[in-house]
Amino acid sequence: MYFHPLHSPDSSLIGYLLADLDEQEAVVIDPPPRQTELVLALLTERSLRLCHVLRTHVHRADAADCSALCDCTSARLVVGEAAALPQDCSREAMRVAHGARLVFGNEVVRVLGTPGHTPGCLSYLWRDRLFCGDAFDVGSCSAGNREADPGLLFDTLTRRLFTLPEQTLVFPAHPIRGRHVATLGELRARYAPRLQQSRDGFITDMMQRRA
């Protein structure tokens, strides 16, 4: 087992490199922009073959950068079924849905459909670790992000993510209140006041905050 966070020096973005050292196969989740050389160096250092580039989500504004690592390795880009991609990326991408399993070496990553921040958002569950992208970014709904859907986000949090074990370690694409990792139990307690209301109440609350 090998786990290496990838921190962008010029943004708050965080990516993650996972590997099976025995089988020398790896995947990378949400590699930050301009970190391709670093990822390649880490792969070379341990003689790893990159199998997949896993994206939790792709915003229209930065879609062009989504396959940079795939262009210089044999890795396959993996995105959600509803992810917006430029045509040159879309032809090569593997689109996956909730319940899919991705294998690298003897390791398995489970795919969870977690729409809300964007329609095509995915989360990836590996061992006791959840890589959730911006699935907990409630602020994007209240701020009026056009790709965000508060109803879908409510469903994702209450029916999918918060049904996982409380000890699950959550690794986001951006720090959550300054933290790079939290347990699911901690996040459940933090978000409880907003999620104790009904789905319609949550949507209304988000829409009112946009005003």
Question: Which ranges hold each PLM region?
Answer:
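Conserved beta-strand hairpin/beta-sheet module of binuclear metal-dependent hydrolase folds
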Residues: 1-48, 123-133
